[in-house]
């Protein structure tokens, strides 16, 4: 998963 703003649409915490 991606837990930081730079992930954009992939943000998933």
Curated annotation (Swiss-Prot):
Keywords: Acetylcholine receptor inhibiting toxin, Amidation, Disulfide bond, Ion channel impairing toxin, Neurotoxin, Postsynaptic neurotoxin, Secreted, Toxin. This is Alpha-conotoxin SIA. Disulfide bonds join 2-7, 3-13. Expressed by the venom duct. Alpha-conotoxins act on postsynaptic membranes, they bind to the nicotinic acetylcholine receptors (nAChR) and thus inhibit them. This toxin blocks muscular nAChR alpha-1/gamma subunits. It is found in: Secreted. Its main location: secreted. The cysteine framework is I (CC-C-C). Alpha3/5 pattern. The lineage of its organism: Eukaryota, Metazoa, Spiralia, Lophotrochozoa, Mollusca. Belongs to the conotoxin A superfamily. The modification Cysteine amide is found at residue 13. InterPro entries: Conotoxin_a-typ_CS. One of its GO terms (molecular function) is acetylcholine receptor inhibitor activity. GO terms for cellular component: extracellular region; host cell postsynaptic membrane.
């Amino acid at each position: 998963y991606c837990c930081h703003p730079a992930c954009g649409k992939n943000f998933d915490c």
